[in-house]
Every structure is written in C-alpha cells, then in structure tokens.
Regions:
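A structural signal for multi-pass alpha-helical bundles of membrane permease subunits
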Residues: 3-4, 9-277
C-alpha cells in the first residue's frame, strides 16, 4: 500500500543506522574500555574479552602524578580565553560584512576562507619567532592570540550566515527611531541570533581545546595543554596505551558535556533560517 514501508527497506535502514552508530561510537567505547583495562591485557594475544576493571590509568592521569589534570586546566584556560577574545572581534566583523556595502567584500570572505583551509603548521615558525621576540613564548596569552587565526575566520563565516537571516526591516525601523549601528547590533541583532552565537562559541571552544599544533611550539612545561601531555606517552621505550586512553577520555569530557547541555541551541543554531515563510 502507498505510504507503508517495505519490511526489507526498513531492515536495511536500521542495519545502516546501526553500522553508522558503531562506526562513530565504537572508537569512543574502545578508548573508554582501554582506559579501565589492565595494561597487561590491552593487546594480549589471544585477546582478553573479559577482564577486571581498574582505575589505575585514570588515577595516574588525574591524581598521581596528575599531570594531565593540570594540562586539562591549561587547555580550559586557553580555550575559554580564545573564545572570549574571539567574539568581540568576529561578531562586529560579521555584522559589517553582512550589512555594510563594501567593494572588496567578496575578497575579504575568500581571505577568511583561505585562512580556514591553510594548515596550522604553516604558521608555526612565524608565530614562534614573533612570540619569542616579544617575550610571550611559553605563556597562555601567546596560545590564545595565535588561536585567533583559526577561530576568528570560522566565527565570522558562521555569524555572517546567521546575521544574513535577520530581516533588514527590523534594523531600518530601529534607525528611524535614531538607533546607531552598535545599538542595533548589541540590542537587536545579537538577541535574535543568540542560538547562532552559542553554536559559534561552542565550535570555537572545541577548535581551541583540540588544537595541538600551536601549543606544541608555544607552550612551556607549565602551560602545556592536554594534547601535548598526551604526546608524552609516546616514548622510545614504548607506548603506554592505557594512559593515552585515559587522557583521551578526559579530553573528550568537556566538549561532550558542552554539547549535551546546549544541544537545543545546536539544533536551533544549525537550522536557523532554514525555513522561510
């Protein structure tokens, strides 16, 4: 009958969904199991399917010596700092590119797109030389500043698309009442695009949190971030996979918590302006 799905089609659909779920969730579950698995059974041959869970790796990561806990705090400082510095520049820039008439607007957007496409390693040596000469190498501020190379272009592209969806008539009515452009931006536009602002901040946070290239050359032992700490488990004497897995679990928690808490804003932000009357 019309409107009814064929049983085979339904089965194939659910099988494909299950395979997709395993493809994306499988590595995460494997890392979690590796973090609580005894090190002697991690890569045993034949594989050990049943084991007694242990928290030794997580204890090493978070408590004794707890280096990764300190590095996670460093990552949090850098990521939050990158977002706080990013928004005051990217939001007005996105508004200007969306509303003001510019001859070179197309080329400016292409320039930002080029920055997004460029590999971060291309900027490592110039930024290292610059930060060393001005005395900021090894500080949180150096990483926060350099991360703007990634976060600001992305945020401008995101926020411009959200601001484009706001009807211009709303701003014109405010201008008739004598409102300046900055009043329109902060009191009218930003409340209307709040879901997009939250989504943009979340993605900028994740970019900064996961970045390992810039902290690799700009951080010191005191300011090293969690991705750099994880690299320390790759040694010439061997690889401690259970410690790497525990550090990876710790690294996954903040982004996962943020996206779970603000999931409704993610849906609203990504579908903002998708339906028009």
């Amino acid at each position: 009958m019309v409107g009814q799905n064929h049983p085979i089609k339904v089965i194939v659909t659910y099988v494909l969904l299950a395979l997709t779920l395993v493809f994306f969730i499988g590595p995460i579950l494997w890392f979690i199991l590796l973090a609580i698995r005894p090190a002697s059974t991690a890569f045993a041959v034949p594989p050990v399917l049943f084991f007694e869970p242990t928290l030794n790796a997580l204890h090493h990561t978070l408590v004794d010596p707890g280096n990764n806990a300190h590095q996670a705090r460093n990552s949090l400082v850098v990521a939050v700092g990158a977002v706080l510095l990013n928004l005051p520049f990217s939001v007005p820039a996105a508004y200007a590119l969306s509303r003001f008439k510019m001859r070179a607007k197309k080329y400016v957007m292409l320039w930002y797109l080029g920055l997004l496409m460029a590999p971060p390693v291309a900027f490592l040596i110039p930024y290292f030389i610059l930060m060393t000469r001005i005395g900021l190498a090894g500080t949180y501020l150096s990483m926060v500043l350099v991360l703007q190379t990634l976060t600001i272009p992305f945020s401008i592209w995101m926020m411009k698309s959200f601001i484009d969806e706001v009807p211009v008539e709303i701003e014109e009515a405010a201008r008739v009442d004598g409102a300046k452009w900055y009043v329109i931006l902060f009191r009218i536009i930003m409340p209307l695009v709040r879901p997009g602002l939250i989504v943009t901040s979340m993605f900028a946070f994740v970019f900064a949190w996961n970045n390992a290239a810039f902290p690799l050359v700009l951080s010191s032992q005191k300011t090293a971030t969690l991705p750099i700490g994880t690299l320390g488990y790759f040694a010439s004497t061997g690889v401690t996979w259970n410690f790497i897995a525990s550090a990876a679990v710790v690294a996954m928690l903040p982004p996962m918590i943020i996206f779970l808490v603000f999931d409704k804003y993610v849906v609203r932000g990504l579908t903002f302006g998708a339906v028009k009357g």
